[in-house]
């Protein structure tokens, strides 16, 4: 069956060839022959056929997204996939033998690969380039409209960054992009459906990447543009989060396809996204999970569920891509967050981590402290009542992480002399110069009556 659904047979192809017979005969005449007048079984002769034959010319193309060879024309036999299959190869061998006397299968295959590479195309680029934007801004409205997310600067910037990164990845494979947008909310909200529609073509979306240490991870990514990591985000822990960070930061895979001889660097053309039903899906990490950008969805606030009118939703998303292409062409953007959004994200991520009891204990102790300088040993002994214990290195490191990332009102200093602890690195209270230092209620002053 042809791509448009019509039944095609060799008799139909025969009619085409009959109309074009002079062309086929011209090709036969132009093929190189040996001293005995027989057709040379050379790559060059095979190339001549693939480049000039009325049936084959332009029909075999290298898909730069999938890395596979696609057949984009009607070759006269029933096909169920655009990608080249073993059956297609056998049919092509038969055709070249019958019409041109070319029988060397290895040389036919080599010529087919060369011809396909010379006629390469990128389906996503071709699709994006034919889009015409109607001038209406939609990128910032996508998540509020279909998933009930907050319509604010953060949501708008994250969504715009994701779409621009996806465009960059198909035009500049392997470009640096290290952020994973994670949609967080209850089951049935349409999170995965949103990402599937965002990929435009369902074949360009995948949620099949279960493990990052799989030897076939490239094959799982091959031909996909938007890749959802749902199962991994559902079981994430302190160790796996580091693995995910490292994985999404990679810009290429080095992989050898089984039938190829040499491994090849394959720059990434995809972006990774995540979904989670759990509010505290990020493990406790006081140094920050800057590669993860959570967006909370609210199914009860949606303007229209994404599956209520699939055609309308897909068209809306397509126009958002047209808008994104205008931004991409302008060149006035970077594939990173603004400083304001980075700072906001750092604080907001805490809402998606388990509660950190140590932060509360230290913050309360500091708020009631009269001194303006502290060090990690002082906090260990006084805030946690370990007066007679010697802190271990990892315990001091944990306190440092809390002070540097989770405590407000204090700034890091390089050194200070402490009466009981000597010269130490530590922290100094940030005092508003326009206000007097506010002491705890129980602290005595020089003016208190005795």
What are these regions (language model features)?
Residues 1-138, 153, 157, 389-394, ...:
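N-terminal nucleic-acid engagement/recognition segments and initiation subdomains in replication
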Residues 55, 59, 64, 68-71, ...:
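Residue-level preference for alpha-helix termini and adjacent loops
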Residues 94, 99-122, 176, 203-207, ...:
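Feature primarily recognizes SF3-like P-loop helicase cores of small DNA viruses
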Residues 112-222, 226, 384:
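P-loop NTPase catalytic core of nucleic-acid-dependent motor ATPases
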Residues 142, 162-166, 193-197, 243, ...:
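Amphipathic alpha-helical segments that form well-ordered structural scaffolds
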